[in-house]
Amino acid sequence: MAAVGSLLGRLRQSTVKATGPALRRLHTSSWRADSSRASLTRVHRQAYARLYPVLLVKQDGSTIHIRYREPRRMLAMPIDLDTLSPEERRARLRKREAQLQSRKEYEQELSDDLHVERYRQFWTRTKK
């Protein structure tokens, strides 16, 4: 009886070994594409989808590709005025003051020429 039991055990082992590779071939997905894959690798999607590739120009002229929230081609970092020579600093300040003065002139050109009586008919109720 013991001999029959051991014979059946060996028969089972040989059939399992023989059908093992065939069973593996039937399974079409790879062993890496199971449910644990997400915990082993990074998520292949951006955290913030609305970021655009932009070229960032630093103060020294070097460039870096970054992702920015607005679709632009290039961003330039502002120049530190403390690192400039006094002549360059004065020239930049003069240029900035000229731009500010032109903006003030433009704001002064806007005047209020609205005639209220001309539009009074639109907000008064008429009797029906």
From Swiss-Prot:
GO terms for cellular component: mitochondrial inner membrane; mitochondrial large ribosomal subunit; mitochondrion. It holds the Pfam family Mitoc_L55. It is found in: Mitochondrion. Disulfide bonds: none annotated. Keywords: Mitochondrion, Phosphoprotein, Ribonucleoprotein, Ribosomal protein, Transit peptide. It comes from the Eukaryota. InterPro entries: Ribosomal_mL55, Ribosomal_mL55_sf. Its main location: mitochondrion. GO terms for biological process: mitochondrial translation; translation. The keyword Ribonucleoprotein applies. The modification Phosphoserine is found at residue 85. The keyword Transit peptide applies. GO terms for molecular function: structural constituent of ribosome. Residues 1-33 form a transit peptide. Belongs to the mitochondrion-specific ribosomal protein mL55 family. Component of the mitochondrial large ribosomal subunit (mt-LSU). Mature mammalian 55S mitochondrial ribosomes consist of a small (28S) and a large (39S) subunit. The 28S small subunit contains a 12S ribosomal RNA (12S mt-rRNA) and 30 different proteins. The 39S large subunit contains a 16S rRNA (16S mt-rRNA), a copy of mitochondrial valine transfer RNA (mt-tRNA(Val)), which plays an integral structural role, and 52 different proteins. This is Large ribosomal subunit protein mL55.
